[in-house]
Amino acid sequence: MGMTPRRKRRGGAVQITRPTGRPRTPTTQTTKRPRWVVGGTTILTFVALLYLVELIDQLSGSRLDVNGIRPLKTDGLWGVIFAPLLHANWHHLMANTIPLLVLGFLMTLAGLSRFVWATAIIWILGGLGTWLIGNVGSSCGPTDHIGASGLIFGWLAFLLVFGLFVRKGWDIVIGLVVLFVYGGILLGAMPVLGQCGGVSWQGHLSGAVAGVVAAYLLSAPERKARALKRAGARSGHPKL
């Protein structure tokens, strides 16, 4: 016991074999899902959540809709969180569905982490903007803003300008395609005075501004790398 196995060879030489004590295990390789699969699944899940919320709202007699953004009211600040999840009716939600799917999917192509941060910035900043200016132009008193269209306008604005900030060909192409297909809806962010109810241009405008802010903030790594590259080129010494 405790002896090392040995095998004699000619000439008296001894070969010692030492057990490693570590059993060999087969190597496992995790397969990373393509970005478009992750993005598509994420957006489909989010839109499915919106339909579930609307179903609950309809079954409750539209009681959830009172949780929208009520401008300049302290309790209306809760709407900043809940408003993008609420819709006035099925028609309202279905009108937002295709833009949510298309623009949301394109947003995820920049990376899921960047998509989450951009959405959070647009969601909160756009909601706060709506809370501040939501009553501007209303001819029938205080308003209550609900719907995911502010998020749509934020994603749209983000996609339009993000490529310009990062100076990457693929992102610029996406921005141009989005401009060609959805550029016309930006008219929905134009102020309309003397309006009673209807489309929330205040939410659209606030969402679009928040989208530009998000694109600028989240393009910081690329902009910083570009600035360092320019600085390095200027400070380079000529070769002798």
Curated annotation (Swiss-Prot):
Q: Which InterPro entries match?
A: Peptidase_S54_rhomboid_dom, Rhomboid-like_sf
Q: What is this protein called?
A: Uncharacterized protein Mb1372
Membrane-protein topology:
Multi-pass membrane protein
Annotated Gene Ontology MF terms?
serine-type endopeptidase activity
Compositional bias (Basic residues) at which positions? 1-11
Q: Which GO terms describe its cellular component?
A: plasma membrane
KW Cell membrane (keyword) present: yes
What Pfam families has UniProt attached to this entry?
A: Rhomboid
Q: Where in the cell is it found?
A: Cell membrane
Q: Decide whether keyword Transmembrane is in the record.
A: yes
Q: Which family does it belong to?
A: To M.leprae ML1171.
Q: Which Gene3D superfamilies match?
A: Rhomboid-like (1.20.1540.10)
Keyword tags: Cell membrane, Membrane, Transmembrane, Transmembrane helix
Main location (coarse class): membrane
